[in-house]
Amino acid sequence: TELEAAVSVPRLVRGDIDLAIVLDWDNRPLSRPGGLCKAPLLEDLIDLAMPAGHPLADRPEVELREVAGEEWVSWPEGEFCHEWLMRTLRSEGIEPRVSHMAEEHHTQLALVAAGLGVAVTPRLGRGPVPQGVALVPVHHTLRRNIHAVWREDADRRPSIRAAVAALEKAAADITE
């Protein structure tokens, strides 16, 4: 079952699920209640997506403040990712103008390809980038972190240990 961390962590605490894979973002760490174990799996870098014809599209990297005046494509309001983006931009002195909201990365990139704004997009699981989109790293690297989380009282269960070990191996294979 795919769930946001705000839903999966409370279900984990209640014992409704045994293990969760959760994300947190560089300036918005996951709130983790006591009684939970966490294993870091991956660090996922985030790029700035802009229309291919944008004046900054050919740069090796950009500063966020260089796109301060742009329209933004974001996740829907109230989502953890949206709040992270707003906090990130405001920490750079940018008051974002969000013109479009979309849950899925591929939808966000399609809006960018149509010239409707700029967006940030994680590298892992991004899928094919539509024609007309340029991806440029951000100078002060943006990232999200991917963790396995489980209850301390389940830490010695062979199934939990095996699942965490398999996730750690898969993560290591991805980063090689």
Language-model features, listed with the residues they occupy:
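Central regulatory/effector-binding core of bacterial HTH transcription factors
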Residues: 1-29, 95, 102
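Short loop/turn segments at beta->alpha junctions
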Residues: 4, 63, 103-104, 122
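Short helices/loops that flank or line small-molecule/ion binding pockets
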Residues: 6-18, 86-92, 105-116
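Secondary-structure junction motif
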Residues: 23-29, 57, 70-92, 156-165, ...
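Flexible hinge/capping segments at coil-to-helix
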Residues: 32-46, 50-72, 158
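Thr-Gly-centered strand-to-loop micro-motif
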Residues: 51, 75-76, 98, 121-122
